[in-house]
Amino acid sequence: MTKIAMANFKSAMPIFKSHAYLKELEKTLKPQHFDRVFVFPDFFGLLPNSFLHFTLGVQNAYPRDCGAFTGEITSKHLEELKIHTLLIGHSERRTLLKESPSFLKEKFDFFKSKNFKIVYCIGEELTTREKGFKAVKEFLSEQLENIDLNYPNLVVAYEPIWAIGTKKSASLEDIYLTHGFLKQILNQKTPLLYGGSVNTQNAKEILGIDSVDGLLIGSASWELENFKTIISFL
């Protein structure tokens, strides 16, 4: 399976830096990168999606066409921008913004009906990991229960919460074992990404694991040169 690199800007990128980054990345890449490189700016960092060398996505959207949903972005907004890719289930939205499994299912089903590419994020907390691998398997299985695992536009990103933003990635052995388990659950055509303190020093090794189909990268992608280095490992 072709390896993938996804950059999640979160809410960290200044607006004009984000715009400049997208334009410079477009100049750097080639058409064959379009379905291998993805960038998820915040809402203010978005531009109309005329890019030909990478795919532009959003970090979040509300599961309605449009309407009285103060502060939200909906599918009509995304259609105007020609954006058809989004993240669902990121741990920061689950924990900080209290998005429940039922609401994540509602999001998934809505954007599935619109044929969006959905990057569905899962991952356990350290307390679960410390209980042993059986507990991890049960937890991750539950996170995947409510979505259609045969949806052809699905990408799954495994991001152990205890590794996100900590500068301490999961060990290669942990990634190997967890991805091996998840591959048994997922459709064989569904890409499975790893995220969690990925950087230019560990990205190549992680990508060398057969069951890792790509990376979802946070802060290490916020500088264009770092992201370009990681892309070169694909």
Swiss-Prot record:
Its EC number is 5.3.1.1. The keyword Iron does not apply. Substrate binds at N8, F9, K10, G165, S197, G218, S219. One of its GO terms (biological process) is glycolytic process. Changing D213A: The affinity and the catalytic efficiency are comparable to the wild-type. The active site is at H90, E159. Involved in the gluconeogenesis. Catalyzes stereospecifically the conversion of dihydroxyacetone phosphate (DHAP) to D-glyceraldehyde-3-phosphate (G3P). This is Triosephosphate isomerase. It comes from Helicobacter pylori (strain ATCC 700392 / 26695) (Campylobacter pylori).
